[in-house]
Amino acid sequence: VVGGDECNINEHRFLVALYY
């Protein structure tokens, strides 16, 4: 995930939803 999932958990989950 670009930007680092550790920094933004919410964005990480959102991106994961888009990727999957």
Curated annotation (Swiss-Prot):
Q: Where in the cell is it found?
A: Secreted
State the post-translational modifications. Glycosylated.
Activity control, as annotated, is: Strongly inactivated by diisopropylfluorophosphate (DFP) and to a lesser extent by tosyl-L-lysine chloromethyl ketone (TLCK).
Q: Which segments constitute the Peptidase S1 domain?
A: 1-20
Q: Per the UniProt entry, what is one GO biological process?
A: proteolysis
Give the EC number(s) under which this enzyme is classified.
3.4.21.-
Q: What is its main location?
A: secreted
pH sensitivity of activity:
Optimum pH is 8.0.
Choose one Gene Ontology CC annotation of this protein and give it: extracellular region
Q: Does the keyword Manganese apply?
A: no
Looking at the record's lineage, which domain of life comes first?
A: Eukaryota
Question: In which tissues does this protein get expressed?
Answer: Expressed by the venom gland.
What are the alphabetically sorted keywords of the record? Blood coagulation cascade activating toxin, Glycoprotein, Hemostasis impairing toxin, Hydrolase, Protease, Secreted, Serine protease, Toxin
**Molecular functions (GO terms):** serine-type peptidase activity; toxin activity
Q: Which family does it belong to?
A: Belongs to the peptidase S1 family. Snake venom subfamily.
Cited function? Thrombin-like snake venom serine protease. Releases both fibrinopeptides A and B from fibrinogen (FGA and FGB) to form fibrin clots.
The entry describes its oligomerization and partners as: Monomer.
Q: What is this protein called?
A: Thrombin-like enzyme okinaxobin-2
Question: What species is given as this protein's source?
Answer: Ovophis okinavensis
Taxonomy-wise, where does this protein's organism fall, top ranks first? Eukaryota, Metazoa, Chordata, Craniata, Vertebrata
